[in-house]
Amino acid sequence: MKILNLFLVSLLLSSCGSGSNKQNPQELNYYDIKGFFEREIKELEKANPTVNKTTVYNQEEEIRTLKIEKWEQELALFSESDINKSSWKGSYKIDSLPNQLIYSAKEEDLRTRKIVIDFKDNKPSKFSIQNKNSNYLYTSIEDLTFYPDSLYIIHKKQKVVLLGGNDYKIVGKLKD
């Protein structure tokens, strides 16, 4: 019985090792959007800025000034637009311009359709992301824009067969 307990404890400890599920940055196929937003979320949580947040749902507008409690939730759509899955290697066309990087989906079934990253002084200054989900019952289009340390915009249009459409937009302006 002692041997079995020791075996189970050692098995448990070995499975909790220092290994990580994150991909090594040298193995990434595309820009590390998920890593960028993870770092940005930590910085925003630390800074705890006040946000002027405008929410528009089907043309009904609400404006509030608040502190965001869960930045991970607030910016989830940006993080979820990561295209660095090993199965997607080669699935995006890469265009590189001075101070701009553009990824365009080559396959129609990919959710993230296009990513444009603008750079200033070799640092990202703007992210523009277009996502689309579609099937025979549902279509969802997301246009996401993020300016580090100043502004984020989430614009989502949904259309559900027999139920109609919804349009919502969130604009968050960070204040010092």
Give, region by region, the residue ranges found by the protein language model.
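Extracytoplasmic electrostatic interaction patches
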Residues: 102-176
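Short, conserved catalytic or interaction motifs in soluble domains
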Residues: 18
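Sec-dependent signal peptide recognition
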Residues: 2-9
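Surface-exposed acidic loop/strand-edge motifs in secreted or periplasmic proteins
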Residues: 41-117
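C-terminal motif of bacterial Sec signal peptides marking the signal peptidase cleavage site
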Residues: 14-15
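Post-signal peptide N-terminal segment of mature Sec-exported envelope proteins
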Residues: 25-47
